[in-house]
Amino acid sequence: MVDRPIEEIVCCMGQPVAGNPTQFIMERAFNAAGLDWRYLTLEVPPENLSGALAGMRAMGFRGGNFTIPHKVAVIEHLDDLSEAARLMGAVNCVNQKDGQLIGENTDGKGFVQSLKKIVDPSGLKVAMFGAGGAARAVSVELGLSGVSEIIVINRTESRGQDLVDLLNNCLLYTSPSPRDS
């Protein structure tokens, strides 16, 4: 008896996901890499998330991407989290390894990898414009990469302060923006 699917299966779970181009892109990337993998786009309402993850685990899916509204709710169903996902409190990718579902957040990783091609962020002082999900992800990854300071500049003081508090609680040094002083 085979405990893995014949083809590796990866999925996207969210609601709404109609029109999401990820399946088109991923299937072509798998093909170009010579991988016999399939990518499924699955419309999963919040009340069915637990069952969908149990199905993902039971059917041996290789992993999945998680989008709204599941990026935070998925955490309670996982076996472990990467450091970045733990700090951000949000997951956008889940990998299944040895029956364990491991959550990751890759939203800020691409930015930092691109930045490192130009300059090493270690020791840099950074200004972050915004405090939403993308800013949160990039700020955490910059902190993990060793920046010396992150100055958060945001339209609303409370949301900016939430990001500053998150970073300070993660032992990263940040400053309020001059506008907030």
What are these regions (language model features)?
Residues 2-119:
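Phosphate/diphosphate ligand-binding glycine-rich loop within oxidoreductases
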Residues 43-45, 156, 177:
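Conserved acidic residues
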Residues 173-180:
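Conserved small/polar residues in nucleotide/adenosyl-binding loops
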Residues 14, 115, 124-143:
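Glycine-rich adenosine-cofactor-binding loop
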Residues 62, 124, 148:
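Short acidic/polar active-site loop segments enriched in Thr and Asp
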Residues 147-167:
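NAD(P)-binding Rossmann-fold cofactor-contacting core
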